[in-house]
Amino acid sequence: MIDRSSRPRILVGTTNPHKVVELGALLDGLGCQLVLPTDAGLEGFDVDETGDTLMANAILKAMAFAARAGMPALADDSGLEVDALGGEPGVRSRRYAGDDASDADRIALVLSKLDGVPVGSRTARFRSVIALAEPGRLVGTGTGTVDGVIGDMARGTNGFGYDPIFLMGDRSMAELTPAEKNATSHRSRAVASIRPILEAWLSAQGHVGDDAMPSRT
């Protein structure tokens, strides 16, 4: 029987409930106890994403959450890069249509800007950066990218963000099951990238993972 109470605690530094669910599934088996901001007394705490890159924002958020909570924190920043839009929305993906815009608003803006652009020129990628920090110290980062094409309409209900217009083969990312998405997504690849750093950090705390996590390429 594993004594879960003795596991190292890591704060999930995000207010996005969809990211909480995905990161929880992707980090399962590492031998750590994931803590939500609400469970750490951080209701309403958010970090201004003032960095000019996804890497800068992921580090900024991990460091800020770790400092505020007084415990290690893991944070993600992700973005959609559309080649025909010069890499936009990129680091501004969440704020692309304004601070108070919905996912539907952001999707509509991207599709309007791509109106008339042929499918062969609608190449895009999702990029994710994950950072692990202790209070006052960055432990490490991981990155992940997945390539696709922007469709001409929203499809599927399983995803969030820009997932409904991001096509991987003949399906949008929002048409994938959660298990399928977690096996192929940019965030899963970022977790795989940072996994050795997490394992080394956990080992230094005297803990090892519960089981092996499938590798992703």
Task: Label the predicted regions.
Residues 2-11, 17-37, 41-217:
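Anionic-ligand binding patches
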